[in-house]
């Protein structure tokens, strides 16, 4: 299985969202994480774009943890042409960088490397009202 994230995603691909924002396409039990914040408002399944449940997914320790992960089982091999992240709808918290890996068996993971051969995918920090905008 191969994955590629072109610098300019194909328009046809962009018209076919994977469905992570839809809990009926990707059920809650197909979203898992390394940990979650104790309050119960930050479950892995709350890490969906445009979600209205909880505060999004939050790792147990919110600050400076580089080893936490959110995993989504897409159920099949698909083309991924873009990735979007969104901040907490109730506060000023959002992802600043992340690593992307893929697997066909949830055991053996291959890191996605960007055009520079770097494993880390950087998200340009944006300051915005997280309850109104998503990028």
Explain the meaning of each model-derived region.
Residues 2-75, 115-118, 123:
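Disordered, acidic Ser/Thr/Pro-rich linker "stalks" and the adjacent N-terminal cap
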Residues 71-73, 81-86, 101:
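Residues within well-ordered beta-strands of beta-sheet-rich folds
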Residues 1-6, 42, 64-69, 90-135:
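Trp- and acidic/polar-enriched beta-sheet ligand-binding modules for extracellular glycan
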Residues 27-29, 75, 79-81, 96, ...:
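A short, local hydrophobic-aromatic micro-motif
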Residues 31-33, 78-91:
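A short beta-strand element within beta-rich, extracytoplasmic domains
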Residues 15, 31, 78, 94-98, ...:
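Aromatic-residue detector
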